């Protein structure tokens, strides 16, 4: 059986960073797999996890539970039966509702395959002070479904956010665990703790299944001879706009960082080619984290998520102007 953990968390909480940390510190003799779902369609998390050494399946452009769970079932079955991993980490979109996923993982058909362990919810406590986030049904249900709450980004904690966290915990913590971390440094031993929270979760009223699964199990890619493309996705009060550029497109380093910093959106995530190699960009609100490597990525991908109308055409125009002379 494959030890399995659901790693939830709202937009920008640090799920992918936490998973990368767990993968970097796992037993080298074990085979791990990651099933990742993103709200947008360009597959940024897949690009970030590509060098982790884990088996990887992506379900971009929506939610794992659409169409009676078919996209997730296909990805799950592929990883379990072909990959036969020792451990499986499942990362749903930050706008995802955990009930359908947990229902599927505990279905009788998966009893011989899955040993479901603790569900971790990665939380940025500052979101408890943000009315839009704190009132979001999926945000609340992610916290309600967790066995362990990981209060991430301790280095960014304010007295107000810590007080909000303690108030929430007194009202909702129960006998669950509350762990503090920064930069996604989650102790891997937490993954082997058992499920404790068996409370029945409500179905999500906000999550209608009327949207169409357009891309199946493949992240957006470029057709041959096409230099770049854009993709839009929307749902649950948010919009995502992402771009993919071919391997020969190189961006101005300072320009792309300023573009990402100033974009009037809540979330920016990307892996792009620059003259020095590649840059990974991760922005949530005003928090901007960048990381560079002196290797070129196979392509460039960047995605923005906004809770309000954004002028994607204007943002795209500015982005295209940041391309340097290509290497082709």
UniProtKB/Swiss-Prot annotation:
Zinc chaperone that directly transfers zinc cofactor to target proteins, thereby activating them. Zinc is transferred from the CXCC motif in the GTPase domain to the zinc binding site in target proteins in a process requiring GTP hydrolysis. The gene is yeiR. Pfam families: cobW (PF02492), CobW_C (PF07683). It catalyses: GTP + H2O = GDP + phosphate + H(+). It is an enzyme of class 3 (hydrolase). Residues 241-321 form the CobW C-terminal domain. This is Zinc chaperone YeiR. Gene3D superfamilies: P-loop containing nucleotide triphosphate hydrolases. It comes from the Bacteria. SMART domains: CobW_C. A motif (CXCC motif) lies at residues 63-66. Belongs to the SIMIBI class G3E GTPase family. ZNG1 subfamily. It comes from Escherichia coli (strain K12). Oligomerizes in the presence of Zn(2+). Its EC number is 3.6.5.-. SUPFAM superfamilies: P-loop containing nucleoside triphosphate hydrolases. Disruption phenotype: Deletion of the gene increases the sensitivity of E.coli to the metal chelator EDTA and sensitivity to cadmium.
């Amino acid at each position: 059986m494959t030890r399995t953990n659901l790693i939830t968390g709202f937009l920008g909480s640090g799920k992918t960073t936490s998973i990368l940390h767990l993968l970097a510190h796992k037993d080298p003799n074990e085979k791990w797999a990651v099933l990742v779902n993103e709200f947008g369609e360009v597959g940024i998390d897949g690009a970030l996890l590509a060098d982790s050494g884990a088996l990887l399946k992506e379900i971009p452009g929506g939610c794992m539970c659409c169409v009676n769970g078919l996209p997730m079932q296909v990805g799950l079955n592929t990883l379990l039966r072909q990959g036969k991993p020792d451990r499986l980490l499942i990362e749903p979109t930050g706008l995802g509702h955990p009930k359908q996923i947990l229902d599927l993982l505990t279905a009788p058909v998966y009893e011989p395959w899955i040993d479901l362990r603790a569900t971790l919810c990665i939380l940025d406590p500052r979101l408890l002070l943000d009315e839009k986030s704190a009132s979001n049904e999926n945000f609340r249900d992610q916290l309600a479904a967790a066995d362990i709450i990981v209060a991430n980004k301790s280095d960014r904690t304010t007295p107000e956010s810590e007080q909000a966290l303690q108030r929430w915990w007194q009202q909702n913590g129960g006998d669950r665990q509350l762990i503090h971390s920064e930069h996604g440094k989650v102790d891997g031993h937490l993954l082997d703790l058992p499920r404790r929270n068996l409370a029945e979760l409500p179905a999500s009223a906000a999550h209608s299944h009327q949207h169409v699964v357009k891309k199946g199990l493949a992240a957006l890619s470029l057709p041959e001879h096409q230099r770049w493309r854009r993709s839009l996705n929307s749902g649950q009060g948010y919009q995502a706009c992402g771009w993919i550029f071919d391997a020969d497109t190189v961006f101005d380093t300072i320009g792309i960082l300023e573009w990402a910093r100033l974009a009037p959106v809540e979330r920016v995530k990307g892996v792009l080619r620059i003259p020095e190699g590649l840059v990974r960009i991760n922005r949530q609100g005003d928090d901007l984290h960048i990381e560079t490597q002196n290797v070129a990525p196979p392509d460039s991908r960047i995605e923005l998520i906004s809770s309000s109308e954004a002028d994607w055409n204007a943002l795209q125009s500015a982005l295209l102007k940041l391309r340097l002379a290509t290497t082709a």
